[in-house]
């Protein structure tokens, strides 16, 4: 009986890293997001425990625990990635299906690179909460921007002689609204890039006052 107790104690001490990692997986509900992978990790852990309880030799579990910790890390990364980034992944996938790679290559590339950067961070440091939050926000902002550019690009492509002017006037109205808010003279007779330049200078002046 005492020998069995000793072996159980050895198992707990030897597997402390794996048991601690299992608590992390439980805290982020990996069993809910990836039940089969979570079950496999638990089965491997149980198998190692049984081996240690039988042999009482930590060396017998060294290699298998290293692999188990790698598997646990992979599961943690997948879970955190799903929780933090899946909505952004879905949006980017939808844009890709809508032809964004060809229609808005620069904006779409920016969005995919921002997502990849967030995924890379999670794969290396899944518990770096503040950094992950910042990268997720950057990826979300890039995806938001790409969706707006895609929608506007499709409007331009869909425009014909009956609604092309309305589209241009709507864009012009956006600049005019800024001018009105700044109490700036009506400059709609100027090219839009010149309107934009003058309004930007006026805003800069307001900020510096």
Functional labels for PLM-detected ranges:
Residues 1-209:
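Long, charged/polar, soluble alpha-helical segments
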């Amino acid at each position: 009986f005492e020998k069995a107790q000793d072996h159980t104690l050895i198992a707990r001490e030897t597997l402390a890293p794996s048991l601690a990692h299992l608590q992390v997986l439980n805290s982020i509900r990996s069993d809910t997001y990836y039940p089969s992978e979570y079950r496999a990790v638990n089965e491997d852990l149980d198998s190692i425990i049984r081996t240690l309880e039988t042999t009482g030799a930590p060396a017998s579990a060294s290699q298998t625990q290293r692999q188990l910790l790698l598997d646990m890390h992979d599961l943690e990364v997948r879970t955190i990635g799903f929780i933090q980034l899946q909505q952004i992944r879905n949006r980017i996938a939808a844009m890709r299906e809508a032809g964004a790679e060809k229609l808005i290559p620069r904006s779409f590339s920016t969005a995919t690179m921002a997502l990849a950067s967030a995924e890379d961070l999670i794969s290396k440091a899944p518990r770096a909460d503040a950094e992950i939050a910042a990268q997720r926000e950057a990826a979300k902002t890039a995806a938001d921007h790409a969706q707006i550019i895609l929608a506007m690009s499709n409007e331009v492509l869909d425009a014909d002689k009956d609604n092309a002017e309305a589209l241009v006037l709507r864009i012009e109205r956006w600049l005019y609204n800024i001018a009105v808010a700044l109490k700036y003279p009506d400059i709609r007779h100027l090219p839009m890039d010149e309107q934009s330049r003058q309004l930007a200078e006026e805003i800069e002046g307001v900020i510096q006052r």
